[in-house]
Structures are given as C-alpha cells and as structure tokens.
Amino acid sequence: MLKKKIGKIVTASAVTACVLVNATAAMLPSMSMVAFAGQELGQMDFNDGVGLPWHICESGPGKMKFNIDGGTYNIEIVEPGGAAKGGESRWDCQFRHRGLILEAGHTYEVKAEVTADHDGQIYTKIGDSGSPYREPWHNGYGGNEGNGWNCMQVTANKTLKIESTFTCTENIEVGEWAWQFGGAGQHQSTDCFPAGTKLKFDNMSLIDKTDDKTDYDVLHPKKDVPEGQVRVNQVGYFSTLQKQATAVVENGTAAQKFSLLDASGKEVYTGTSSATRYDEDSQQYIQVLDFSDFTTAGTYTISCGGKGSYSFKIGNDVYDGILTDAVNYFYQNRSGIDLEEKYITSTGMNESKADLVHVAGHVPDTAYIQSKWIKSYKADGSDVDKSSGTLNGQGGWYDAGDHGKYVVNGGISIWTLNNMYERVLDSDNNSKESKWADNSGTVVIPENGNKIPDILDETKVEMDWMMEMVVPSGYKMTYDASAYGGSDTGKYENMVFHKLHDHKWTGLGVRPNDYADEWGTIRIVKPPSTAATLNFVANAAQTARLWKDIDSTYADKLLKQAKLSYEAAKANPELYAPLDQAIGGGAYGDTNVKDDFYWAACELYATTKDSSYLTDMKGYADCFKVTTNLEGGENNGSFSSFNWGNTAGLGSLTMYLNRDILDAADAKTLSDSIKKAADTYIAKEEEQGYGIPYQGATFTDAINLGYDDSGKLIEVNGYEWGSNSFVVNNAIVMAYAYDITKDAKYIDGVSTAMDYVFGRNAMDFSYVTGYGTYHCENPHHRFWSHELDSTFPYAPSGVMSGGANSGIQDPYVRGMGYKLGTLAPQLCYIDSVEAWSVNEVTINWNSPFAWVVSFLEDEAPLVDRDTPATTAKTTEGGTTSTTTSTGTALYGDVDCNGKIEINDIVLLSRYVAQDATAKAPTAQGLINADCENNGSIDAGDITAIARYLAHLCEASELGPQ
C-alpha cells in the first residue's frame, strides 16, 4: 500500500498507463475533454466523472475520502493530520496533478476554483515534485512575491477563484500542481480545516502561452490498442492440451463459425462456437471457441464474427524463457546485495539489463526491536521503542512493492519454490532434477557454480534471513490479549519476530540504498507471533530435508532450530499478529494458527519421521485434506486451497510427496481429497466464461475500505486482492491431481488457468510483464517506477500482477471514476505503478506462477491422450492404483471377461481389502471398477456392482452418467 509524502521526485505519465483502452473501452469512463492549445493538464472540469491524473495523496495520519460527481472532484477531510497527531504538516492531505514540464522563459496562465463548506486555509503551488523544491508559482503569485509560505483564506460556501499568470525562470522537468490542506506543523500554525470539511475542485487549467510542445496530449499520446473481441492466451497453447478462446458477443447471438488463421492469414482450421451465455464475472455475453484438436505448431490468430484476436503460438515450447524470468524475480528483489547485470535475465521494456541494477540496500539492516504492537508511529519516529535493542535483519527478499520483509509471506514463498524442486524428486512425474542442477541456466544467480541446485541457493537467501528473526533470550514484550485475542506466557525465546519494515510509508520512485535520509524512515522489527514461528518451523524443516544430502551441517542447524521453535510455539499457541498493523508495511495479521501448527507438524514429520509429529498432525480437523474454502485471518470463504494466511494445504501437499511414510488409508484420504479439490476447480473453469478456476467472495477491509456512515464495515462482493494468486495456487492443486492420476483433464485445467493469466480474460490483457502482445507494464513497485520517474527502470519480464480486485482500494483506481460494486469483478484493474490495490506484485504470487510454468513445460509435451493412464502409488501399507482412460469401459467388469458377474465383486473386494494373495485387477479392470465415477476404488464400487446384480439398477447407471 502506498502513502506518499510531499516532495518526492516523480514524472507522472498518469493516465497513459492507467487507461486500458481495448475491447473493454466501452466499460471504462470516457476520458474525453475539451482541448486547449498549450494545456498542460490531463483533466480540467471532471464532467465525465474521471479525476485522473488529479488524485488525492495522504500521509498518515492524514486521511481523506473522495468522489467525482456533479462535475466536481469532491474531497472530505476525515483526519487532517499534522505534527501533533504524529504527522508532518499541511501536506498530510493533498490533491495534486503530476507529470508537468515547465520551461524557462515561458509564460503560463493558471485558473482554478475551489469551494469548502467550512472556513479554512489552503496552499497551492506549481513547481518541483521534490528537491530542490522550486516553486515558480504559488497561491496566485510568481515566486515568493507578496505571499511567502502562507496559505490563502477560504470562506465557507464561497468559491475561491484563481486567475493568474507567471513566467517560469528555470526549467522544471519533474513538476506538479499540488493543493495542501492538512494539519498544523512546519509552515502551518493551525489545521487548515477541521475534520469533516468537504472541498470541491473544478475548472482547473494550466496553459503554456508560449507554445504547445509540453501539452498533456503531446507528452501522453493515447495508446493505439487494436480492438478485438476474441480473447486468447497471448503467449500460446501447448499442442496436446485443451485450447479455448472466448469471444465477446451481443445477447442472442447464435452459435457461429470461427477460423484459425496462420501467420500469412490463411485459414487452417474452422470450428463452431458454443451457444451464447452470460458471464457474471465479466458481465459480458460470451461464446467459447474450442480448437483443442488442432495441434500443428505455429503462430496464429482467431477470427469470429468479424472480430479478431491477438496472435498466439501453438507448440510445446510456448513457455520458453518464462520460468527463468519468473524465478529471477527473487534475485532482483534480494535485500543487502548489489544487483549485477550479468545475473539479470531480461530487459523488460528497458533499453538494457543495466537499467535494472542498483546498489545494495539495507546493509546492514539494523532495526529496532519493538516490545509491543503499535499500529502507527509519529512521522519523525520519536515514539519508536529503542529500549529493546536492535536486530540486524540483513538479507532475504523484499516482499512486494515496498522494502518490508515478512516471515509469513516469506514462508509460503520458500515453501512453493522448495516444493517445486521437491516435486521433481518424485519418480512418478516427468520433471527432471537436472533442470534445477547447478549452472543449468534455469536460475541465474551469483551462487551458480557452487555444486548446489540453484533454486535451493535462492530459497536459502530467505531461509537465512528467517534465522536472523528468531527471538533471542531475554526479550520481553507486552501483549494486549484483550485487543488481539489469544494469550501470552511471557516466554519468547525461540519464537520468531513477525516482520521487519520502515516505521512509516515511503513513496514510489525510491532506491533501496538511498531513501532513508530523505524520507526520515526508521527500520523496526514487530513482536513475535505464533504464525511467524510456525512458518519458520515449516520452512526450516522442509529446507533441512532438501539439504541433508547436500550440506548436512546446515541441514542439522535448521532442523535443530525448527524443533526448538516448534516447542516455543506450542508454549505460546495464541500469540496472534493483529490484523491492523499496516502502516510502513503490510499487516499480515493472523488470528487463526491451527493450520500453521498442522503445516509445521507435516514438515517435521516428513523430515524426521518422528511419530509425535504425526500425532500432532492428526489433531487437526482437516488432516490429510486439501480444501477449497479458506476461512480465518484475512479470509472469509476464499475459493482456494491455501495462501499465506491459510497454510494447511501446504502441509497436505508435502505429505503427498512423502506419502511413503503414510499408511494406505491416510495416503488414500489425501489423494482422494486432492482429486476432489481439483475437480471442484475444473467444474468452476467450465462454468466460467473465461475459464478461470476462481470465484469471488464477500470480504471487508477495515484498513483500506473502512466503515460506512452507520459504523458498519463496508462489504465487497467480488474478486479479492491478488485474485491472480488464487488462480495459480488453485492450478497447483490441479497439477497434483494430474500427478496422481495422469488424467489429462487435470493438466488441461492447469493450462486453462494460465490462459486466464496470459490474456483470456475480460481485459484482453496478459498480467505478466514482457509476455503477450498486450501485457502488464507498470506493476506497483518502488524501484520499477519508470512510469513516474524516467530515471527508474520498468519492471523486468516474468512478473505477475495481482490483478483484478473488486475492492479497488487505492485512490488512483478510484480516480478513474470507479465506484464499489458498479464494475464487473474482472474489469476492476488498471495498469499503473500507483494502482497498488490491483497491480501489486509480491514474492508469494510470483512463486506459484513459477511453479505452474515449470510444471507445464515439463508435463505438457508428454501428455498422451490415446492410452489409459495408470499411476501406481506405493505406500507403507501397500499399493493403490488409479487409472483413467479415454477409451471404452464396461463398468463393473473388473476381471475384463466381457461380463458383469459375482466374480467381479470377489476380485474387487479382495483388492479393496488389500489381500496380498489375490491377483490385482489389470489397468483396464481398475477403470471398469470405478462404478461411482469418483476417481477412487472403494467399497462404494462394490455396492454399485451388487445393486446391478440384484437388478436394483441398470448397467447404464454404472460409471459416468
């Protein structure tokens, strides 16, 4: 989340990057306005309901609400801020337009109107966005002429009109027009306005009377994006997998022909669309176009009903390069090292890889250890607790767009990348260990050449940082159980601190090595939590398991600390991280840690085989299960199997990879649960117009959305923050189902999920930088801030945006005129670095993105749809087989003699009972045995055959219905 401060150098390209003008243009507010020669502003009268590039800017504790209605930009001051309340001054509440260029010797005409419903003061200035803070015009005067730093007086309900001219004496290349009306502080003896004041802005104008070379329309020409109504995976489709596109049509359109065209425009395939149906998540009428049976490699487009698509490829190499770029995200977000050009794998939209290098940040990363949870600190940091000493938290990964480092988010990210590697050690799939071998080229990092799998080198960076977050002896804290719930023992040694970040927010366009002095930030470590401790335990145990044959000393060190920290967590089972600690860093609150205990026990059991951990695992209600509904913490019925706040699914997937230490019944429960979850996601894909294995939820956001006028939390029904992360996490579950069954429907499900990410969505937009014709360019990131400041780089390729979010919490998105509940979930997106609620990137989103890409590039080329797929899974209690077929089955004919008879019941009964003296059914026999068509062979199938032999059902009622 972004809280910006007055005076940060930026060059806002504003609306250019934010307006996704394509096939959804009709869904977006119009940006049309009357143009004037020399007009420097991108918006003047707000008559079309759009505010951008004008936007509010808050610095805590300053807070505002706004809307764009009635032809004015309307702002309510909720809290003016100011030094006495922990802020700075009047710039705690601002309204501004950035991206201005002013030229020496040019004369400018300024006009504006502002009305307030209370008497007060306001300061307005045109000049530098940051140092050296030149102001060729403020408050109607050029320079400091006749005004100094004083404000203009505003009379309640009387419009203040400004009409002025000035001549600029110096070139200003990074300029802004800002209005300041916050609290008392430097240069401001009183609050500008009381809380509750409402202001209206209108008829803004800044005209260069000398020439029009820096007109807004000249500097920010509209992007000419081809309009198409056929949405495809813009990267491409694997030859042997399902291939579907979505056409946007009018209601009532009949099923119609579509054509696949090669690069020369020649028609090479035709098909017929599905019937027209309404897609709720896009609020569009759509037809699905299926061309799965076309397998010829090449580059193509689709034509349907006179509309076309972006180009895409078909082949088995369509994802080449993506994995390397996706995992390079982690190198480029390392803390505490100089980034070097030779380890950067892509240029993105930059001129060269050299644009992406920077000097090491936070060396050392000295942070003050906090003894209590404090929601916000004073801007000057005078109330930061320094009595508990410091911790050097150097290293690790920066979490997202900010410079914070968080144990719980690092936890799932380490697990996902480690799990991606551990999966290749399973001989039952087609992934090769050599892919991750040292110096293989998949992962490009400074550790190449040390004879250690490179992906493990990368996760070790974060694991080693976590080790630094372990609580030392003697630490004391004050925990407010009445406010946060849970309980406190007062003994914290071997617990783990929750997070490390700045004491307040910084702005965008900052380098990790040089912002602290300018922004006045202090690094802090928040108190320990049970959730952070258990994340550490799980990661340390998992990492120890993978390193034991590589570096036993390191593995032993991790495992020893994991055991100690696990016992510390059991002694503090309810030391919760509050949900509201979101100033200076993400909150990452968690008040339900039963799932974390289960995950930690799973990892410890998989590593040690100590039965005490198995006992702990079995105390969890959903032991050996993968669910599709996340509850607790920040989730309220999220349609997914795991995320950073709900980690039980991680433990279950770990146990699947280590199923040889489970008994047959537990192994079967686990595999059946994975398949059931995957089937749920496939069913959702088939229901959705764009094939997304996700659905929205009803959620609240006390921090960013707050409460309505009656004091009730504002509820949103739609896509959640980081919706794309749910898509790729759910794809991982389908991938495991494919590993279990080798049933192509599951890998089709994985591929279909990625189709959505790469462009088959309502935005007709690839959410991954550098991949797809029309792709993400400006994710929310402090260093990758070229959109705002041309001295900073664009993001590299291979970065996945969080995507559509019905909460649209940030003022930039709201500045488009979007209002809660009025826009289709899939359309709640803008590609801007300032749109932190919809365009954030983070380690726990890029890790599953990399996982899924890795899976598909290994497995997709080897899918065989012409033969039954049988996979034997060896367990401690025996062998179970799961077989699927695309051929013909006689359900009930277990012994494959062409008849259904009592012998089939006998054979199947002995198989289910694991009678080692009996001959097992053949692969086809197991297909025939699945009479309930649920992907498992059990007593229910025996009953089904018995019902048939007793003439209680027809043969046609066995198997698929």
Segments (PLM) and residue ranges:
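Extracellular carbohydrate recognition and processing domains
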Residues: 133-174, 278, 284
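Extracellular glycan-recognition surfaces and repeat-rich motifs
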Residues: 45-83
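Cellulosome-associated attachment modules in secreted, modular CAZymes
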Residues: 21, 28, 867-961
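Secreted extracellular polysaccharide-interacting domains
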Residues: 53-58, 77-104, 121-150, 176, ...
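Extracellular beta-strand ligand-recognition surfaces/modules
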Residues: 46, 124-126, 160-199, 203-204
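Aromatic (Trp/Tyr) and acidic
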Residues: 234-305, 333-411, 415, 419-420, ...
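Extra-cytoplasmic beta-strand recognition segments
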Residues: 44-48, 95-122, 162-168, 203-204
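Long, well-ordered core segments of solenoidal/helical folds
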Residues: 317-340, 458-474, 559-577, 611-635, ...
